[in-house]
Amino acid sequence: MSEANLTECELAYQLTYHPFYMIAQFWSFFVSLLAMPSLIFFMVEKVFKLPFHGNLKFLLVSYFIGTFLFASIICFTFGYHFFVPFFVTSNCDLIINATLFKYGHMIALIFMTIPMILPTAFTVERFVALKMAHSYEHVRTLLGPVLVLVVIAIDSMFLYDIYGQEKFDKPFINFILVPATSALQFNSFLWYMLYLKITNFICNLILLFIHKILHQSSRYRRKNVSLSVKYEMQEISQSSRFTLIVTFTHLLFFGWYVSTILLIRTVGPDFFRGFINYTVMRGVYCATPTYNLVIVFIGFKALNHLNFKRNNKVQSTIQIKSTGQEGAENYDNAISNYWDSVYTMNKSKL
């Protein structure tokens, strides 16, 4: 029987039991299963304890909670792909129930796309923090929650525009395969997301460059600049470097996924010598689930490194020299301050 004449049940059978497809489904399930406790541990040990401003901390907590929820839904959907074939009694049982597909597909997309857009909110918040460096430590946590709501609203609008008229009335074999009627719009959406992430990454680099210029300028090196402002500038630098690392890592994995899936759809079935192989390649979804686990290790390493540099910077900032001409001046100033305080205390007692 030619592939063009395959029924949906026969197609589901040949796709589901394809060795490469099964290995890919198991990999996505396995890394998602590992990612869930790893993300919880990372959030408890690191993210919830970050010394960053409340606005950025709220954004980062939201980002990693979204990543955890995405790993959870991927663990369920790909676990379904891998384990259900061992228990079915007919080929048609491999077809996913339309209602189950609708909710599984949409929930997976929501928690996949929100973390895609959230790094843009990191950049907006960081630019605001840099602009208000002299007073940002006193700003209450409001911008972060507002940006999260804006991101959710924008993401919901995009997805509604893509799936608003989708009936989900076709047989479905895989939770991540976009219905044919919505595929073109979804492809355009992925391109927009890729452009957005590249632009956001460039903005992060510009932010750090501006910060470096300001930090080296005489305005922030004067002695009359308060220690709190210097600390705030240092905090902006450290937190911006961390968000840059998160943004770049997400861009790397997401860019690989988007480039691969769009290339597969562009070359079509003929390149893969048949519709079955073509569908197998479309159903392979490893890059983004792998990111959910890898970001934990990168996050731990990045924060430990930044904290080490931060502690060294703080120690070098508050250290008082005790040798040479500067050490002698510091000693004289300390003695003078001590006797001035003693004189003031004795005078007040008289």
Swiss-Prot record:
Cytoplasmic topological domain: 43-57, 125-141, 211-243, 304-350
Presence of the UniProt keyword Glycoprotein in the record: yes
Where does it reside? Cell membrane; Perikaryon; Cell projection, Dendrite
Chief place where the protein resides: membrane
Q: What happens when the gene is disrupted?
A: Abnormal distribution of male-derived sperm in the hermaphrodite uterus following mating, with sperm accumulating at the spermathecal-uterine valve 1 hour following mating.
Name the protein family: Belongs to the nematode receptor-like protein srb family.
Q: Where are the transmembrane segments?
A: 22-42, 58-78, 104-124, 142-162, 190-210, 244-264, 283-303
The taxonomic lineage of its organism, from the top, reads: Eukaryota, Metazoa, Ecdysozoa, Nematoda, Chromadorea
Q: What does this protein do?
A: G-protein coupled receptor. Plays a role in the navigational capacity of sperm and promotes the targeting of sperm derived from males to the fertilization site in the uterus of hermaphrodites.
Task: Please list the residue ranges that the record places on the Extracellular side of the membrane.
Answer: 1-21, 79-103, 163-189, 265-282
Give the way it sits in the membrane.
Multi-pass membrane protein
Give a GO cellular-component term.
perikaryon
Please list the residues annotated as glycosylated: 5, 97, 277
Q: What InterPro entries has UniProt attached to this entry?
A: 7TM_GPCR_serpentine_rcpt_Srb (IPR002184)
Ordered alphabetically, the record's keywords are: Cell membrane, Cell projection, G-protein coupled receptor, Glycoprotein, Membrane, Receptor, Transducer, Transmembrane, Transmembrane helix
Q: Which organism is it from?
A: Caenorhabditis elegans
Xref: Pfam families: 7TM_GPCR_Srb
Protein's name according to its UniProt entry: Serpentine receptor class beta-12
The free-text tissue note of the record is: Expressed throughout the head.
Q: Which biological process annotations from GO are given for this protein?
A: sensory perception of chemical stimulus
Q: Which GO terms describe its molecular function?
A: G protein-coupled receptor activity
